[in-house]
Amino acid sequence: MKSEKPDSLTPVQWLICVIAVIGFAFDTYELLMLPLIIRPALEGLGGLKFGSPGYNQWRDLFFYIPAISGGIFGLLGGYLTDKLGRRRVLTWSILVYAISACAAGFATSLPVLLFLRCTTFIGVCVEFVAAVAWLAELFPHPKQREAVLGYTQA
């Protein structure tokens, strides 16, 4: 039996795409905010002067450690997504991401802020993996799946 190529998305599929775009926009926002907040954070929480060795060291840590932790847990997220299910992992990763990002606003020291940035990146990276896998499952036709994944992440 041949499966027919769908001509367009259903209203529910459009809603899923819109929600995915909004979610990916928040992910991008969160990941790209660091260059804007790093200087005030290091000066305010650490009392560090711009360009000093301590400032440069903390700046580097804030850029590299969260990225490494997010990358490692993103790989682990793929495994967890397969084992525990896309929806469950997606839900928990969004909670980790949201709680960590909110708590980071109340950080009182640089180590606490760094830890919360790491957990935020972990949540974002795991959420991204789970969301892409779930979108791929929801759109079984190859051309439609390619278009949906491309447009929602653009």
What is the meaning of each model-derived region?
Residues 1-154:
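Transmembrane-helix signature of 12-pass secondary carriers
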